[in-house]
């Protein structure tokens, strides 16, 4: 029970009694009058009159006349039913209203009206007023209610009363909002409690209630006594006292003080001698008349000192004495002590939300941890958590001043905005959890799988480097022969090497894609269409996420490099790859990697070579047969030498690098001759005559595409680009444009090769003629 009051009572009150007390305690009180007259619950009719005179009637004085007090009965559902009483006629007559509504001020005022009717002997008016209120629906909070003699009850705002003076009622009240914080002086209970008890005793009583002790409060004034009980219990909000709760104990129930379980009981001072004769042990006793508190425990010292000092300073301020200052000061203390319960809520798909006690207790200071270890065993805290979980699992959610105080005070470790969104979606039936767990976008799932595989591969890379370092120390191996495991691999390495070789051979035997976009293999066409669909569904989130880690990838794959750059040697190494010695091949998990990262390339290369960023960029922007040929292959290394850093980091010299790459490549391929180069006018479907020539022409095309991609990389990569820009296997309209660009590049390369060959032949002829002349 997170709340002891009934949520939706059927009516404003259940019973009204007029009870007379005899001069002798041995005689039971007698019911003189009741409303409604047909009320038939005999148990209530027998027990309520005994609560109407909770004192020693033989010793009571005349000063009890006109006092209001409230007792509480608990029904079979553990809900509290309040008995609002007013003593009249020298304390021998008591008017009592029984209701589930904790409207203290309203019913105290109504009791005064009823006492006035009885004093004037206006029984007809009394019955008419009660009948109207009894049959009227329960008014909503903050709604004005007007009681008029000989008229039905009507609900109206203050403006209506001003416009129609004839409707001025005999009694008027506003239905209180019991969900808000009590205020001073509007709340009679809190006002009397704050005035009667000093701050130190309030703190001691608060600490004892948090430890669920057996507590007795004593006073000679019934109104002050019950006000202190109700007021102190209200300061536990959002928690409620879960044990024996008797605001004022009648003489026939004094044995309850000997109960072994926790209780909160108010006793009139005329009965205190009888209580002390029962030899009470481990009882916290507060005497309101003398403002003293006796306790065998040091409960206040068990609370965190910072929480206690802040609460004490707040209560001593003059500004706290009015409004909700007192209630809010205790609410803030409750939030500081228990507000971190949010961080201990746990949810698993298909299971109800639960509360983890271990997570709630850990990571706190020693004093706070010690208190929370005790608090998790308290009934008031357990019922509070059960109530919160019940609302969450029912999809209702909750939002009250306690949750607002936690958020504003920062008493939980989570993000307040995420918590508010969480509660908001829980009100809709837990849609956020279902969406997050079962309807995640492909980009989110891809990022999750990538991060998981990346972590595993990172560990393997560290192990590989450590093993290589040991081998270098033992055998003196050259650093250029190190085989580095690529950081980004889109294949599953659990498969065997034989399976990967089969896949590599299958790719090498695959027919080339013609420049007009037609594929010769139906299976490849199906695979590409499925891959393109996946890539378009993933969206741009994964691209942005993966691009953030691009620099870290470059750092991890960077190999030691010393000496001057040998661009010609590097280009020759790039062109000297052999189809018989391919790297590990596998299908890519997501095509977002090709769209979002410039440094990832799946190119068939030698195992013994180190990765280079110059040959990593061209696949992302390439198209045609080369991009199709290299799909899904491993870029683990280029053998021999290490290539220079990424061209993207040398913006100022990019133009010089372009021309240098082209000249070096042309010079390195002079020995092939003009006969090995396809005629640029021979059409689009030209054929490569030998593996070496194929590698040469392919290298030229690759280099040209790489240089084109470098210029794109100088812009902000991965931002503002269309998703299809980096997909080399897209067909239809866009491929025609890309094909024309490739044709232009091929024409330039082939023409340049022809010019170089002709120039070389002319040089050879001139050299021969010169030698002949000299001879």
UniProtKB/Swiss-Prot annotation:
It is found in: Cytoplasm, Cytosol; Cytoplasmic vesicle, Clathrin-coated vesicle. GO terms for molecular function: guanyl-nucleotide exchange factor activity; phosphatidylinositol phosphate binding; small GTPase binding. Residues 180-316 form the cDENN domain. Highly expressed in dendritic and natural killer cells and at lower levels in other myeloid lineage cells and in pituitary. Significantly up-regulated in effector memory T-cells as compared with naive T-cells. Changing residue 502 to A: Almost completely abolishes AP2B1-binding. Changing residue 500 to A: Greatly reduce AP2B1-binding. InterPro entries: cDENN_dom, dDENN_dom, DENN_C, DENND1A/B/C, Tripartite_DENN, uDENN_dom. Residues 695-706 have a biased composition (Basic and acidic residues). Residues 318-395 form the dDENN domain. One of its GO terms (biological process) is regulation of immune response. It comes from the Eukaryota. The modification Phosphoserine is found at residues 535-536, 549, 552, 652-653. The modification Phosphotyrosine is found at residue 520. Residues 14-143 form the uDENN domain. GO terms for cellular component: clathrin-coated vesicle; cytosol; intracellular membrane-bounded organelle; nuclear speck. A motif (FXDXF motif) lies at residues 398-402. Guanine nucleotide exchange factor (GEF) for RAB35 that acts as a regulator of T-cell receptor (TCR) internalization in TH2 cells. Acts by promoting the exchange of GDP to GTP, converting inactive GDP-bound RAB35 into its active GTP-bound form. Plays a role in clathrin-mediated endocytosis. Controls cytokine production in TH2 lymphocytes by controlling the rate of TCR internalization and routing to endosomes: acts by mediating clathrin-mediated endocytosis of TCR via its interaction with the adapter protein complex 2 (AP-2) and GEF activity. The FXDXF motif mediates interaction the AP-2 complex. The clathrin box motif mediates interaction with clathrin. It is linked to Asthma: The most common chronic disease affecting children and young adults. It is a complex genetic disorder with a heterogeneous phenotype, largely attributed to the interactions among many genes and between these genes and the environment. It is characterized by recurrent attacks of paroxysmal dyspnea, with wheezing due to spasmodic contraction of the bronchi. Interacts with RAB35. Interacts with clathrin heavy chain/CLTC. Interacts with components of the adapter protein complex 2 (AP-2) AP2A2 and AP2B1. Interacts with CD3E. This is DENN domain-containing protein 1B. The gene is DENND1B.
């Amino acid at each position: 029970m997170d709340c002891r009051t009934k949520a939706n009572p059927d009516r404003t009150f259940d019973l009204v009694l007029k009870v007379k007390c005899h001069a002798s305690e041995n005689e039971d009180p007698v019911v003189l009058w009741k409303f409604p007259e047909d009320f038939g619950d005999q148990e209530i009719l027998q027990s309520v009159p005994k609560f109407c005179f909770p004192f020693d009637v033989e010793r009571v004085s005349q000063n009890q006349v006109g006092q209001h007090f409230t007792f509480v009965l608990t029904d079979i559902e553990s809900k509290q039913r309040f008995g609002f009483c007013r003593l009249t006629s020298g304390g021998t007559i008591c008017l009592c209203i029984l209701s589930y509504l904790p409207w203290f001020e309203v019913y105290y005022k109504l009791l005064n009206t009823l006492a006035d009717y009885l004093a004037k002997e206006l029984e007809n008016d009394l019955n008419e007023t009660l009948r109207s209120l009894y049959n009227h629906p329960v008014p909503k909070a903050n709604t004005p209610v007007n009681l008029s003699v000989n008229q039905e009850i009507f609900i109206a705002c203050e403006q209506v009363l001003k416009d129609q003076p004839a409707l001025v009622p005999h009694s008027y009240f506003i239905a209180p909002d019991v969900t808000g914080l009590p205020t001073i002086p509007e709340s009679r209970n809190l006002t009397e409690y704050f005035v009667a008890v000093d701050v130190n005793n309030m703190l001691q009583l608060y600490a004892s209630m948090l430890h669920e002790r057996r507590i007795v409060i004593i006073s000679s004034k019934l109104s002050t006594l019950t006000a202190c009980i109700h007021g102190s219990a209200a300061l536990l909000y959002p928690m409620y006292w879960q044990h024996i709760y008797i605001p004022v104990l009648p003489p026939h129930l004094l044995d309850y003080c000997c109960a072994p379980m926790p209780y909160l009981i108010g006793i009139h001072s005329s009965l205190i001698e009888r209580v002390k004769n029962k030899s009470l042990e481990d009882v916290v006793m507060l005497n309101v008349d003398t403002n003293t508190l006796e306790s065998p425990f040091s409960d206040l010292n068990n609370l965190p000192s910072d929480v206690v000092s802040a609460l004490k300073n707040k209560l001593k301020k003059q500004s706290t004495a009015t409004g909700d200052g007192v209630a809010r000061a205790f609410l803030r203390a409750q939030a500081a002590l228990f507000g971190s319960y949010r961080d201990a809520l746990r949810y698993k798909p298909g299971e109800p939300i639960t509360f983890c006690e271990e997570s709630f207790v850990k990571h706190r200071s020693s004093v706070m941890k010690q208190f929370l270890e005790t608090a998790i065993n308290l009934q008031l805290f357990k019922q509070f958590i059960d109530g919160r979980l019940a609302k969450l699992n029912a999809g209702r959610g909750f939002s009250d001043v306690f949750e607002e105080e936690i958020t504003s005070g920062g008493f939980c470790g989570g993000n307040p905005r995420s918590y508010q969104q969480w509660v908001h979606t829980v009100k809709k039936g837990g849609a956020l959890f279902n969406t997050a767990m079962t309807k995640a976008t492909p980009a989110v799932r891809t990022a999750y799988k990538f991060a998981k595989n990346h972590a595993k591969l990172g560990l393997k890379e560290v192990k590989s480097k450590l093993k290589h370092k040991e081998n270098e120390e033992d055998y003196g191996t050259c650093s250029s022969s190190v085989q580095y495991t690529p950081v980004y691999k889109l294949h599953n390495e659990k498969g065997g090497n034989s399976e990967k070789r089969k896949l590599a051979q299958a790719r090498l035997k695959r027919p080339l894609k013609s420049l007009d976009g037609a594929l010769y293999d139906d299976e490849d066409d199906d695979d590409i269409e499925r891959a393109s669909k996946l890539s378009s569904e993933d969206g741009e989130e994964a691209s942005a996420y993966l691009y953030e880690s691009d620099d870290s990838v470059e750092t991890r794959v960077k190999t030691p490099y010393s000496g001057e750059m040998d661009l010609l040697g590097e280009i020759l190494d790039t062109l000297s790859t052999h189809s018989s010695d391919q790297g590990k091949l596998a299908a890519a998990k997501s095509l977002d990697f090709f769209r979002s990262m410039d440094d990832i390339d799946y190119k068939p290369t030698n195992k013994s070579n180190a990765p280079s960023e110059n040959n990593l960029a061209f696949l992302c922007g390439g198209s045609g047969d080369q991009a199709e040929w290299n799909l899904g292959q491993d870029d683990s290394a280029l053998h021999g030498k290490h290539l220079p850093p990424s061209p993207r980091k040398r913006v100022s010299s990019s133009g010089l690098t372009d021309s240098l790459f082209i000249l070096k490549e042309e010079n390195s391929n002079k020995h092939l001759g003009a006969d090995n180069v396809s005629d640029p006018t021979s059409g689009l479907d030209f054929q490569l005559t030998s593996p070496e020539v194929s590698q040469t022409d392919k290298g030229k095309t690759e280099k040209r595409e790489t240089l084109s991609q470098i210029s794109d990389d100088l812009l902000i990569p991965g931002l503002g680009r269309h998703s299809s820009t980096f997909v080399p296997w897209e067909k239809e309209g866009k491929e025609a444009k890309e094909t024309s660009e490739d044709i232009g590049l091929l024409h330039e390369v082939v023409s340049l090769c022809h010019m170089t060959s002709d120039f070389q032949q002319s040089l050879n002829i001139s050299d021969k003629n010169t030698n002949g002349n000299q001879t």
